[in-house]
């Protein structure tokens, strides 16, 4: 039996209580909404019980570590829930029906893939720990306070990290979807989102840096290419309106065709492509300030940060969302139950 998270509700059925959406506009702090946009958000909020009923597991109501359910559910933070729903609505250009479908699909994906487990519970090959870090500066520019760094040039053993998570010998009970690399990469994304405050206009999105230094584009491992395509698809479908900017640095000039290809194939929307910054060097001083970066990323200037790792270590500590902890605990309990059943 594959592992799924089961979230306890007051009753066995999903609540059909009408959500109070009369003051939706007052709960949204991340942006100004028009009257029409507020009306559509109210409709999406009111459709939450319907959305949950349409999922494979109606009891699973978590997105980005927060509860997506009716107002009276004890785990719901109404403001955060509304901000998350707004991101889905914006991504689908305020088409309520399309946003509802996306939410159903995302809840199904999260229930099956378990991204919170990938972020906080699973252990990966040590090499993967060298491929990415999260850095933070609470005083940084708007929606660039927290950054995920992807350091592809440090990948030395692609065959190993692109194996199925857990290896071929892992029990089917509690087995996880995807390769080590995929689960690690999704986990980094989930961790970075825990630093965001969806109700703060200056910190409701994160930034990403993809460093291609020492990467041979012509001899890139086919597994890397396949996983990159898969990650782009997953992020596009399940992580809407969460990136403020995406830097591609130390990119060979001739690789510009990649971004034209992504746009032509419709893999990434034109709106998302506007957030891309493609640099043939690694100097990010213009966006983050030279004093907030190690020399390798600020044009060679000396700073208090000797390395990217030192910058990551300086990131303020924080706690993950309370509901994420609840989901993780219940997932563990479900694994134990499934294991006992398989033994019986």
Curated annotation (Swiss-Prot):
Heme binds at residues 152, 185, 210, 212, 246. Residues 139-305 form the CRAL-TRIO domain. Its cofactor is heme b. Pfam families: CRAL_TRIO (PF00650). One of its GO terms (biological process) is regulation of exocytosis. It is found in: Cytoplasm; Endoplasmic reticulum membrane; Microsome membrane. PROSITE patterns: CRAL_TRIO. It is a peripheral membrane protein. GO terms for molecular function: heme binding; metal ion binding; phosphatidylinositol transfer activity. It catalyses: a 1,2-diacyl-sn-glycero-3-phospho-(1D-myo-inositol)(in) = a 1,2-diacyl-sn-glycero-3-phospho-(1D-myo-inositol)(out). Transmembrane segments: none annotated. CDD domains: SEC14. It comes from the Eukaryota. Its main location: cytoplasm. Keywords: Cytoplasm, Endoplasmic reticulum, Heme, Iron, Lipid transport, Membrane, Metal-binding, Microsome, Transport. GO terms for cellular component: cortical endoplasmic reticulum; cytosol; endoplasmic reticulum membrane; plasma membrane. Non-classical phosphatidylinositol (PtdIns) transfer protein (PITP), which exhibits PtdIns-binding/transfer activity in the absence of detectable PtdCho-binding/transfer activity. Regulates PtdIns(4,5)P2 homeostasis at the plasma membrane. Heme-binding protein that may play a role in organic oxidant-induced stress responses. Belongs to the SFH5 family. This is Phosphatidylinositol transfer protein SFH5. It comes from Debaryomyces hansenii (strain ATCC 36239 / CBS 767 / BCRC 21394 / JCM 1990 / NBRC 0083 / IGC 2968). The lineage of its organism: Eukaryota, Fungi, Dikarya, Ascomycota, Saccharomycotina.
